[in-house]
Amino acid sequence: ALETSNGIHFVAIGGDEHGNIHGNFGWVTIEGEAVDITYVADE
């Protein structure tokens, strides 16, 4: 996990039985809205 001083965070979770990597990252916009992205890297 990584979090920067300006509020960006990133987490990568190890592969599953198919070798896919799961993770998420996010930040807070200038307007104060939280943005969170969750992904599966499968290729």
Curated annotation (Swiss-Prot):
InterPro entries: Insect_cuticle. Keywords: Cuticle. It comes from the Eukaryota. Residues 1-43 form the Chitin-binding type R&R domain. Pfam families: Chitin_bind_4. GO terms for molecular function: structural constituent of cuticle. Component of the cuticle of the larva of flesh fly. This is Larval cuticle protein SC1. It comes from Sarcophaga bullata. The lineage of its organism: Eukaryota, Metazoa, Ecdysozoa, Arthropoda, Hexapoda.
